[in-house]
């Protein structure tokens, strides 16, 4: 068990066993544990539920700190905000906390659809929820948001996809492959049988450097945004922020999420026809790319938005790029809150 993945660092959360989970790749998890953090309470008819899935490396604590609060669009005094940690992130069932044949490198290949299926079971059987006022997520959370809206069109009343696409691009697939190789080519990785996460420090450091290169935009560094965050040089930013962020994480967990991220694609439901898949969506949908995102570009997001009925394109302006999702740009968060508040006040489908 990796001591990083504890309530002390990421809590509080509740571990909920939803039972066996058949996976799209053919295996079955004998029991699937979902780490869930709830903010606010359900109203009498349970019509105020909002689902927030997590992104690559992120946990429910980050979602709470960055996006949830009284006076914000995601206001726990008005809504019951249910944050579900994705499978493989270290809090929910993952390579680092599962025994038997699923331990470590034996952990199953999990798809975005498996997360959404598990979340649907959680919401319907544990919470007794029959619809969601909103599903909102960033990056891999956006991938899950799209999967929800396509797979369960009558369940989702509103959807907000932030900095993510419904079908991953070939360019992004390749970049994620390089993230994977940064870890797996470390000799200490030992095919996933490393003695501890810290033993794979060199691989995790390379992984962090790649995230620095693509996660933040060139403009972020050229204009000195890293200095505004307290780092006098790019190297200090890499060492003091990015390497420090990823260093305690379990490599096998990161690989589980990266494999899943690469294969996000709602068109699996329609034989590869993306327009047909997105045409299923009934939810009032806001598509919100980040202007300087190098992973999920504005153009990629716009081309998908045009295929979604009852959708609007609401790009977020931030030179921070994809990792503006970390909440480093207060003006971007203001834009996001305004869009989400507008979406929540609009009629459902």
UniProtKB/Swiss-Prot annotation:
Keywords: Hydrolase. The keyword Cytoplasm does not apply. One of its GO terms (biological process) is biosynthetic process. It comes from the Bacteria. Homodimer. Esterase that catalyzes the hydrolysis of ethyl acetate. Involved in the degradation of short chain methyl ketones (MEK) such as 2-butanone and 2-hexanone. In vitro, can also hydrolyze vinyl acetate, 4-nitrophenyl acetate, methyl acetate, propyl acetate, benzyl acetate and methyl propionate. The highest activities are obtained with acetic acid esters, but the alcohol group also plays an important role, as compounds with two carbon atoms in the alcohol moiety, i.e., vinyl and ethyl acetate, are by far the preferred substrates. This is Ethyl acetate hydrolase. It comes from Pseudomonas veronii. The lineage of its organism: Bacteria, Pseudomonadati, Pseudomonadota, Gammaproteobacteria, Pseudomonadales.
